[in-house]
From Swiss-Prot:
Catalytic residues of the enzyme: 63, 105
Disulfide bonds listed in the record: 42-131, 44-60, 59-111, 65-138, 66-104, 73-97, 91-102
Binding site for Ca(2+): 43, 45, 47, 64
Chief localization: secreted
Cofactor field: Ca(2+)
Name of the protein in its database record: Basic phospholipase A2 chain HDP-2P
Originating organism: Vipera nikolskii
Tissue: Expressed by the venom gland.
């Protein structure tokens, strides 16, 4: 399933929420940083189960939960307004659903930045067999 997410990110056009989320991550952590989070731990990438492996993986768990609360539009496809101001992500004037998606992505990108010291290369492309514990509730 994670491979499908990678393909989806690669195939998405110049706009679209996943592309915008990738730009937020790269803006906070540097060019091409998004590739470090596409398949990481138990929650970064498509789907998720088990217990987050570290603070970085927990950022993805919280992001998944946030997307799960969004109502009224598709979080992975909707296009929202945002910008960077003095290194900070600022969500623009969006309606309720788009505002919620932007906030989910902004919080996750900031979380990755705040927890970059917990990033563990051993959790990249982690086998799903290492994520079989009972999943936490959002």
């Amino acid at each position: 399933m994670r491979i499908l997410w990678i393909v989806a990110v690669c195939l998405i056009g110049v706009e679209g929420n996943l592309f915008q989320f990738a730009k937020m991550i790269n803006g906070k952590l540097g060019a091409f940083s998004v590739w470090n989070y596409i398949s990481y731990g138990c929650y970064c990438g498509w789907g998720g189960q088990g217990t987050p492996k570290d603070a970085t993986d927990r950022c993805c768990f919280v992001h998944d939960c946030c997307y799960g609360r969004v109502r009224g539009c598709n979080p992975k496809l909707a296009i929202y307004a945002y910008s960077f101001k003095k290194g900070n992500i600022v969500c623009g004037k969006n309606n309720g659903c788009l505002r919620d998606i932007c906030e989910c992505d902004r919080v996750a990108a900031n979380c990755f930045h705040q927890n970059k010291n917990t990033y563990n290369k051993n959790y990249r492309f982690l086998s799903s067999s290492r994520c079989r514990q009972t999943s936490e509730q959002c």
